[in-house]
C-alpha cells in the first residue's frame, strides 16, 4: 500500500439475520434491519444484488433501503415472520484508500504533500461546526476533557501535529479492553479518560472528543472489518485538516501495533486506513432510516442488525447475524 500510494478492494458480501427459537412468532409483523455500506468517503459503487426473505426473493414493498449517504445505512425488511425464515441481503462495493506518510519524521519535515479536499460525507462542503460541537451525553467537553486536551496538545498550533499528539496519547496510555454494553455507560468518553481502558469504539470516541476540544473537526466512522479471514465489528475515527481533508485514526489498531513494537503500523493508523472496511455508520447514535418503533438493542452503532415486532424489539440473544464473504478482489488504486 505504501509503495503504491494506496490500495483498493472490491467486496461482495452477504448478511443474514435469523430469529432464534424462543423469539419466533409465526405470522406476526416484523421489521428486520441489516447494515449496508454508506456510499461516501472511501466507498464507491455500492450495488444491491439480492434481497431474500426465507427461500425467496423479497418483493419490493417488503423492504426499504436507506439513502446512500445515510448517517447509519441499513436495509429494513417489513413483512410477516414465518418460523425458520431468515432475512438476507447480498451487496458489493469498492473501498479505495490513499496512503500518506504522517509519521513523526514526516511531520517534522512539513508533512506529506498537501492536497485540496474540501468536500465531506455527501460530496459537498460539510458544516465544520457540526464536527467541532459537543454531542451529549458522550461527546462533552467536561473539565477533565478540557484539561486533558490542553495537557496533550500543549503549545502546538499545527492541527495535524495536534491530532497526532492526541493519537499518540491514546495509543500509548489507553489499554484495549472489552467493555460492557455502551447502553450501560452514562458517559463513555469520561469513562475512557478516567480508566484509561476501552475497546475500539471507546477509544475512537475519546479521540473524537479530544480533537474537538482542541479545535480539530472529528467524526465517527464504524461498521465491519472485512478481511479474507474474518468479518467482525469495528469502530474508528476521522479527523479534518485544511491541508489534507478528512483522514483516519484507528486508535485500537494503532495501540496494538505500538505495544508490539511495530512502529510502522503505529504510524500507519494515524492518517491512514487499510481497505478492509465496510463503513455502515458515519455518526454515533443516529436513528435508522426508517427508524425503529422500539428501543434498539444497540442504539449507538450499526453492525449486527436489529429486529422488532409490533410490541417490542428483540434482545441480542434472540437473533443471530452472519456475514459471508462471497468474493474479494484487489483493484487498482
Label each residue range with its predicted role.
Residues 95-97, 176-177, 197-200, 225-228, ...:
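Solvent-exposed loop/turn segments at secondary-structure junctions
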Residues 202-292:
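Hydrophobic/aromatic-rich core segments of domains that either
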Residues 32, 166, 237:
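Terminal peptide-recognition signature
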Amino acid at each position: 500500500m505504501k509503495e503504491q500510494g494506496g490500495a483498493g478492494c472490491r467486496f461482495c458480501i452477504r448478511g443474514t439475520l435469523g430469529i432464534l427459537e424462543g423469539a419466533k412468532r409465526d405470522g406476526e409483523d416484523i421489521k428486520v434491519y441489516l447494515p449496508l455500506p454508506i456510499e461516501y468517503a472511501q466507498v464507491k459503487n455500492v450495488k444491491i444484488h439480492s434481497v431474500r426473505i426465507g427461500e425467496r426473493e423479497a418483493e419490493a414493498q417488503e423492504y426499504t433501503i436507506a439513502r446512500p449517504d445515510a448517517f447509519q445505512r441499513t436495509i429494513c425488511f417489513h413483512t410477516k415472520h414465518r418460523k425458520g425464515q431468515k432475512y438476507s441481503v447480498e451487496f458489493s462495493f469498492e473501498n479505495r484508500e490513499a496512503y500518506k506518510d504522517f509519521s513523526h519524521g514526516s511531520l517534522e519535515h512539513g508533512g506529506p504533500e498537501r492536497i485540496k479536499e474540501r468536500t465531506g460525507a455527501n460530496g459537498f462542503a460539510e458544516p465544520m461546526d457540526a464536527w467541532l460541537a459537543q454531542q451529549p451525553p458522550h461527546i462533552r467537553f467536561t473539565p477533565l476533557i478540557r484539561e486533558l486536551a490542553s495537557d496533550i496538545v500543549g503549545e502546538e498550533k499545527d492541527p495535524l501535529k495536534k491530532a497526532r499528539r492526541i493519537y499518540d496519547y491514546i495509543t500509548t496510555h489507553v489499554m484495549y479492553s472489552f467493555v460492557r454494553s455502551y447502553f450501560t455507560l452514562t458517559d463513555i468518553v469520561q469513562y475512557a479518560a478516567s480508566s484509561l481502558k476501552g475497546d475500539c469504539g471507546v477509544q475512537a470516541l475519546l479521540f473524537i472528543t479530544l480533537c474537538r476540544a482542541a479545535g480539530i473537526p472529528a467524526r465517527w466512522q464504524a461498521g465491519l472489518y472485512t478481511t479474507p479471514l474474518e468479518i467482525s465489528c469495528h469502530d474508528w475515527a476521522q479527523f479534518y485538516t485544511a491541508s489534507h481533508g478528512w483522514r483516519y485514526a484507528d486508535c485500537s489498531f494503532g495501540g496494538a501495533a505500538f505495544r508490539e513494537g511495530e512502529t510502522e503500523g503505529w504510524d500507519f493508523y494515524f492518517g491512514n486506513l487499510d481497505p478492509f472496511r465496510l463503513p455502515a455508520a458515519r455518526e454515533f447514535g443516529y436513528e435508522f432510516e426508517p427508524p425503529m418503533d422500539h428501543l434498539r438493542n444497540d442504539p449507538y452503532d450499526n453492525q449486527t442488525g436489529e429486529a422488532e415486532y409490533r410490541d417490542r424489539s428483540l434482545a441480542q440473544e434472540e437473533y443471530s447475524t452472519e456475514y459471508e464473504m462471497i468474493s474479494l478482489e484487489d483493484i487498482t488504486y
